[in-house]
Protein backbone atom coordinates (compact mmCIF):
# COMPACT_ATOMS: atom_id res chain seq x y z
CA UNK A 1 0.00 0.00 0.00
CA UNK A 2 1.38 3.41 -1.01
CA UNK A 3 0.04 6.94 -1.41
CA UNK A 4 0.22 8.71 -4.79
CA UNK A 5 -1.80 11.59 -6.28
CA UNK A 6 -4.18 11.70 -3.30
CA UNK A 7 -4.90 8.01 -3.82
CA UNK A 8 -3.95 4.81 -2.06
CA UNK A 9 -2.52 2.16 -4.34
CA UNK A 10 -3.01 -1.45 -3.23
CA UNK A 11 -1.22 -4.32 -4.94
CA UNK A 12 -3.09 -7.58 -4.43
CA UNK A 13 -1.12 -10.38 -6.10
CA UNK A 14 -3.60 -13.07 -5.05
CA UNK A 15 -6.68 -11.51 -6.61
CA UNK A 16 -8.52 -13.50 -9.28
CA UNK A 17 -9.41 -10.37 -11.23
CA UNK A 18 -7.54 -7.04 -11.12
CA UNK A 19 -4.20 -6.93 -9.34
CA UNK A 20 -3.77 -3.20 -8.64
CA UNK A 21 -6.46 -1.03 -7.04
CA UNK A 22 -6.71 2.69 -6.34
CA UNK A 23 -8.73 4.21 -3.50
CA UNK A 24 -9.56 7.89 -3.03
CA UNK A 25 -7.85 9.06 0.18
CA UNK A 26 -10.63 11.49 1.09
CA UNK A 27 -13.68 9.30 0.49
CA UNK A 28 -12.19 5.82 0.94
CA UNK A 29 -13.95 4.68 -2.24
CA UNK A 30 -12.41 2.59 -4.99
CA UNK A 31 -11.85 4.74 -8.08
CA UNK A 32 -9.87 2.53 -10.45
CA UNK A 33 -8.03 -0.71 -11.03
CA UNK A 34 -5.98 -2.50 -13.66
CA UNK A 35 -3.90 -5.59 -14.33
CA UNK A 36 -4.87 -9.21 -14.68
CA UNK A 37 -3.02 -12.49 -14.39
CA UNK A 38 -1.45 -13.34 -17.72
CA UNK A 39 1.11 -12.30 -20.33
CA UNK A 40 -0.64 -9.34 -21.96
CA UNK A 41 0.75 -5.75 -21.94
CA UNK A 42 -0.96 -4.90 -18.66
CA UNK A 43 -0.93 -8.39 -17.20
CA UNK A 44 1.35 -9.77 -14.51
CA UNK A 45 1.75 -12.90 -12.42
CA UNK A 46 3.03 -11.85 -8.99
CA UNK A 47 3.42 -8.04 -8.89
CA UNK A 48 5.08 -6.22 -6.01
CA UNK A 49 5.43 -2.48 -5.50
CA UNK A 50 8.90 -1.05 -6.21
CA UNK A 51 8.45 2.71 -6.31
CA UNK A 52 6.93 5.65 -8.12
CA UNK A 53 8.15 8.53 -10.26
CA UNK A 54 9.15 11.82 -8.62
CA UNK A 55 6.02 13.40 -10.12
CA UNK A 56 3.89 10.65 -8.59
CA UNK A 57 2.18 9.83 -11.88
CA UNK A 58 3.93 6.53 -12.61
CA UNK A 59 3.94 3.35 -10.55
CA UNK A 60 6.74 0.79 -10.90
CA UNK A 61 6.00 -2.87 -10.22
CA UNK A 62 8.26 -5.91 -10.07
CA UNK A 63 6.69 -9.04 -11.52
CA UNK A 64 8.40 -11.75 -9.50
CA UNK A 65 7.50 -14.68 -11.76
CA UNK A 66 8.15 -12.91 -15.07
CA UNK A 67 11.44 -11.41 -13.79
CA UNK A 68 10.75 -7.92 -15.10
CA UNK A 69 9.76 -4.40 -14.13
CA UNK A 70 6.64 -2.77 -15.51
CA UNK A 71 5.88 0.92 -15.13
CA UNK A 72 2.36 2.28 -15.59
CA UNK A 73 1.42 5.93 -16.03
CA UNK A 74 -1.76 6.96 -14.21
CA UNK A 75 -3.76 9.90 -15.56
CA UNK A 76 -6.76 11.44 -13.81
CA UNK A 77 -9.56 12.54 -16.10
CA UNK A 78 -12.53 13.87 -14.13
CA UNK A 79 -13.66 10.85 -12.10
CA UNK A 80 -11.87 8.34 -14.31
CA UNK A 81 -8.38 6.89 -14.06
CA UNK A 82 -6.51 5.99 -17.24
CA UNK A 83 -3.65 3.48 -17.12
CA UNK A 84 -0.94 3.09 -19.75
CA UNK A 85 2.10 0.81 -19.84
CA UNK A 86 5.06 3.22 -19.85
CA UNK A 87 7.83 0.65 -20.17
CA UNK A 88 8.84 -2.91 -19.46
CA UNK A 89 12.37 -3.94 -18.51
CA UNK A 90 13.78 -7.39 -17.95
CA UNK A 91 15.99 -7.78 -14.91
CA UNK A 92 18.98 -10.07 -14.46
CA UNK A 93 18.57 -11.90 -11.17
CA UNK A 94 21.33 -13.61 -9.15
CA UNK A 95 22.00 -17.29 -9.69
CA UNK A 96 21.31 -19.85 -6.98
CA UNK A 97 22.80 -23.29 -7.61
CA UNK A 98 23.21 -22.44 -11.29
CA UNK A 99 19.67 -21.19 -11.83
CA UNK A 100 18.35 -17.63 -11.94
CA UNK A 101 16.30 -16.77 -8.86
CA UNK A 102 13.97 -13.78 -8.62
CA UNK A 103 14.38 -11.04 -6.03
CA UNK A 104 11.88 -11.40 -3.22
CA UNK A 105 11.49 -7.65 -2.81
CA UNK A 106 12.85 -4.51 -4.50
CA UNK A 107 12.74 -0.78 -3.71
CA UNK A 108 13.65 2.34 -5.69
CA UNK A 109 15.93 5.13 -4.43
CA UNK A 110 15.82 8.81 -5.39
CA UNK A 111 19.23 8.71 -7.09
CA UNK A 112 18.00 6.16 -9.62
CA UNK A 113 19.37 3.00 -8.03
CA UNK A 114 17.31 -0.02 -7.02
CA UNK A 115 17.93 -2.38 -4.11
CA UNK A 116 16.87 -6.02 -4.36
CA UNK A 117 16.80 -8.66 -1.63
CA UNK A 118 17.06 -12.38 -2.18
CA UNK A 119 16.26 -14.16 1.08
CA UNK A 120 18.09 -17.41 0.45
CA UNK A 121 20.92 -18.92 -1.56
CA UNK A 122 23.38 -16.02 -2.03
CA UNK A 123 26.40 -14.83 -0.05
CA UNK A 124 25.27 -11.21 0.26
CA UNK A 125 21.81 -10.18 1.38
CA UNK A 126 21.34 -7.10 -0.85
CA UNK A 127 21.97 -6.39 -4.53
CA UNK A 128 22.34 -2.85 -5.88
CA UNK A 129 21.02 -2.27 -9.41
CA UNK A 130 21.51 0.78 -11.63
CA UNK A 131 18.75 2.59 -13.53
CA UNK A 132 19.07 0.05 -16.37
CA UNK A 133 18.65 -2.80 -13.85
CA UNK A 134 22.21 -4.01 -14.21
CA UNK A 135 23.93 -5.31 -11.08
CA UNK A 136 26.33 -2.80 -9.50
CA UNK A 137 27.35 -4.66 -6.36
CA UNK A 138 26.13 -7.29 -3.91
CA UNK A 139 26.51 -6.20 -0.29
CA UNK A 140 25.39 -6.69 3.29
CA UNK A 141 25.48 -9.63 5.69
CA UNK A 142 22.52 -11.80 6.61
CA UNK A 143 20.70 -10.63 9.77
CA UNK A 144 21.79 -13.72 11.77
CA UNK A 145 25.57 -13.98 11.77
CA UNK A 146 26.50 -16.01 14.84
CA UNK A 147 27.26 -18.97 12.57
CA UNK A 148 30.34 -17.25 11.16
CA UNK A 149 31.17 -18.15 7.60
CA UNK A 150 28.96 -21.25 7.59
CA UNK A 151 26.15 -19.66 5.59
CA UNK A 152 25.24 -22.89 3.86
CA UNK A 153 23.02 -23.99 6.72
CA UNK A 154 21.48 -20.54 7.06
CA UNK A 155 20.59 -20.00 3.46
CA UNK A 156 19.05 -23.44 3.12
CA UNK A 157 16.94 -23.46 6.26
CA UNK A 158 16.11 -19.92 7.32
CA UNK A 159 13.59 -17.58 5.76
CA UNK A 160 14.62 -13.95 6.05
CA UNK A 161 11.35 -12.72 4.68
CA UNK A 162 10.99 -9.05 5.46
CA UNK A 163 9.80 -5.64 4.43
CA UNK A 164 11.92 -3.23 2.39
CA UNK A 165 11.29 0.51 2.21
CA UNK A 166 13.19 3.55 0.96
CA UNK A 167 13.37 7.25 1.67
CA UNK A 168 15.67 9.48 -0.34
CA UNK A 169 18.80 7.42 -0.92
CA UNK A 170 18.35 5.23 2.16
CA UNK A 171 16.91 1.73 2.26
CA UNK A 172 15.38 0.18 5.36
CA UNK A 173 14.85 -3.55 5.93
CA UNK A 174 12.81 -5.13 8.72
CA UNK A 175 12.66 -8.89 9.32
CA UNK A 176 9.20 -10.44 9.53
CA UNK A 177 10.02 -13.36 11.83
CA UNK A 178 12.25 -11.57 14.35
CA UNK A 179 12.81 -8.05 15.64
CA UNK A 180 15.62 -6.87 13.39
CA UNK A 181 15.93 -3.70 11.30
CA UNK A 182 18.77 -2.09 9.36
CA UNK A 183 19.48 1.02 7.31
CA UNK A 184 21.90 1.44 4.42
CA UNK A 185 22.64 4.68 2.57
CA UNK A 186 23.57 4.48 -1.12
CA UNK A 187 25.80 7.22 -2.54
CA UNK A 188 25.35 8.69 -6.02
CA UNK A 189 28.44 6.69 -7.01
CA UNK A 190 26.71 3.46 -6.04
CA UNK A 191 28.57 2.82 -2.79
CA UNK A 192 26.47 1.28 0.01
CA UNK A 193 27.15 2.20 3.63
CA UNK A 194 25.69 0.49 6.68
CA UNK A 195 24.33 3.28 8.89
CA UNK A 196 22.94 1.04 11.63
CA UNK A 197 21.35 -2.29 12.43
CA UNK A 198 19.39 -3.10 15.57
CA UNK A 199 17.88 -6.19 17.15
CA UNK A 200 14.89 -5.12 19.24
CA UNK A 201 13.98 -8.44 20.87
CA UNK A 202 15.49 -11.81 21.68
CA UNK A 203 15.30 -14.16 18.71
CA UNK A 204 13.78 -17.45 19.83
CA UNK A 205 15.01 -20.28 17.62
CA UNK A 206 16.80 -23.60 17.77
CA UNK A 207 19.43 -25.25 15.60
CA UNK A 208 18.40 -28.54 14.01
CA UNK A 209 19.93 -30.47 11.11
CA UNK A 210 22.45 -27.68 10.50
CA UNK A 211 19.64 -25.17 10.16
CA UNK A 212 17.75 -22.64 12.23
CA UNK A 213 14.09 -23.15 13.13
CA UNK A 214 12.06 -20.39 14.76
CA UNK A 215 10.08 -21.35 17.84
CA UNK A 216 6.35 -20.83 18.17
CA UNK A 217 6.69 -18.26 20.94
CA UNK A 218 8.88 -16.12 18.66
CA UNK A 219 6.12 -13.61 17.90
CA UNK A 220 8.19 -10.51 17.23
CA UNK A 221 8.76 -9.14 13.75
CA UNK A 222 8.10 -6.33 11.29
CA UNK A 223 5.30 -6.74 8.79
CA UNK A 224 5.60 -3.44 6.94
CA UNK A 225 7.51 -0.14 7.06
CA UNK A 226 6.74 3.40 5.87
CA UNK A 227 9.32 6.18 6.13
CA UNK A 228 8.93 9.97 6.25
CA UNK A 229 11.47 12.80 6.56
CA UNK A 230 11.79 12.24 10.33
CA UNK A 231 10.14 8.96 11.28
CA UNK A 232 9.87 5.25 10.55
CA UNK A 233 6.40 3.76 11.03
CA UNK A 234 6.34 -0.01 11.37
CA UNK A 235 3.76 -2.67 12.17
CA UNK A 236 5.48 -4.83 14.77
CA UNK A 237 4.96 -7.83 17.01
CA UNK A 238 1.80 -9.87 16.95
CA UNK A 239 0.07 -13.06 18.00
CA UNK A 240 1.03 -16.61 17.06
CA UNK A 241 -1.22 -18.51 14.70
CA UNK A 242 -0.72 -22.23 15.36
CA UNK A 243 -2.02 -23.43 12.00
CA UNK A 244 0.24 -21.07 10.12
CA UNK A 245 3.16 -21.98 12.37
CA UNK A 246 2.68 -25.68 11.71
CA UNK A 247 2.70 -24.92 7.99
CA UNK A 248 5.98 -23.03 8.49
CA UNK A 249 4.42 -19.87 7.09
CA UNK A 250 6.20 -16.55 7.55
CA UNK A 251 2.73 -15.09 8.13
CA UNK A 252 2.53 -16.86 11.48
CA UNK A 253 2.86 -13.49 13.16
CA UNK A 254 0.03 -10.98 12.74
CA UNK A 255 1.02 -7.53 14.05
CA UNK A 256 -1.22 -5.59 16.41
CA UNK A 257 1.28 -2.86 17.29
CA UNK A 258 2.40 0.29 15.49
CA UNK A 259 5.94 1.35 16.39
CA UNK A 260 7.40 4.79 15.64
CA UNK A 261 11.19 5.14 15.34
CA UNK A 262 13.52 7.94 14.31
CA UNK A 263 15.96 7.64 11.40
CA UNK A 264 18.59 6.23 13.75
CA UNK A 265 16.31 3.28 14.47
CA UNK A 266 15.60 4.42 18.02
CA UNK A 267 12.02 3.61 19.16
CA UNK A 268 10.06 6.70 20.15
CA UNK A 269 6.75 5.10 21.02
CA UNK A 270 4.29 2.35 20.24
CA UNK A 271 0.53 2.10 19.87
CA UNK A 272 -1.78 -0.86 20.27
CA UNK A 273 -4.03 -1.36 17.24
CA UNK A 274 -7.63 -2.52 17.29
CA UNK A 275 -7.18 -5.16 14.60
CA UNK A 276 -4.52 -7.44 13.19
CA UNK A 277 -2.87 -5.49 10.43
CA UNK A 278 -0.45 -5.73 7.56
CA UNK A 279 0.71 -2.66 5.65
CA UNK A 280 1.12 1.00 6.56
CA UNK A 281 1.36 4.09 4.34
CA UNK A 282 1.71 7.86 4.74
CA UNK A 283 -0.35 10.31 2.70
CA UNK A 284 1.47 12.45 0.15
CA UNK A 285 1.04 15.59 2.26
CA UNK A 286 2.17 13.76 5.41
CA UNK A 287 -1.06 14.60 7.23
CA UNK A 288 -2.40 11.05 7.61
CA UNK A 289 -1.22 7.53 8.33
CA UNK A 290 -3.06 4.62 6.73
CA UNK A 291 -3.13 1.11 8.20
CA UNK A 292 -4.47 -1.85 6.22
CA UNK A 293 -6.13 -4.39 8.49
CA UNK A 294 -6.16 -8.14 7.96
CA UNK A 295 -9.26 -8.71 10.07
CA UNK A 296 -11.73 -7.46 8.97
CA UNK A 297 -10.25 -8.12 5.55
CA UNK A 298 -8.79 -5.13 3.71
CA UNK A 299 -10.30 -2.54 6.02
CA UNK A 300 -8.19 0.64 5.94
CA UNK A 301 -7.87 2.91 8.96
CA UNK A 302 -7.04 6.61 8.52
CA UNK A 303 -5.26 8.26 11.46
CA UNK A 304 -4.24 11.91 11.73
CA UNK A 305 -0.46 12.19 11.90
CA UNK A 306 -0.88 15.10 14.31
CA UNK A 307 -2.59 12.80 16.82
CA UNK A 308 0.20 10.22 16.61
CA UNK A 309 2.97 12.77 17.10
CA UNK A 310 1.16 14.39 20.01
CA UNK A 311 0.97 10.99 21.72
CA UNK A 312 4.73 10.63 21.31
CA UNK A 313 5.29 13.87 23.21
CA UNK A 314 3.16 12.82 26.20
Predicted regions and their residues:
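Asp-box/WD-like beta-propeller blade repeats and closely related beta-sheet repeat scaffolds
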Residues: 65-68, 74-111
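Blade-loop segments of beta-propeller domains
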Residues: 29-60, 64, 89-96, 152-153, ...
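Short, conserved, GDST-rich strand-edge loop motifs in beta-rich repeat architectures
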Residues: 235-253, 300-303
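Structural signature of eukaryotic scaffold interfaces centered on beta-propeller domains
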Residues: 1-4, 49-55, 100-111, 154-168, ...
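Beta-propeller blade signature
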Residues: 22-24, 75, 126-131, 248-265, ...
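Beta-strand-rich domains and repeat architectures in extracellular enzymes and scaffolds
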Residues: 1-19, 230-243
Amino acid sequence: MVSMQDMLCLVRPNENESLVYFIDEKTGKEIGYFGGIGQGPGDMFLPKFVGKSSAGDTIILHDFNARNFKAFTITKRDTTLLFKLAYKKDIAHPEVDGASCGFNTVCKLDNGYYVGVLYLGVDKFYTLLDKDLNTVIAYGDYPLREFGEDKKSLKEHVSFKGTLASHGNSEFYGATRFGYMSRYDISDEGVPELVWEHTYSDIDYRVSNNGVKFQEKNVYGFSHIAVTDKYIFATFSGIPNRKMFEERSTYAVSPKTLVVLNHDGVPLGRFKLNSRCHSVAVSGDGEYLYIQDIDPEDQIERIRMKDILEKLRE
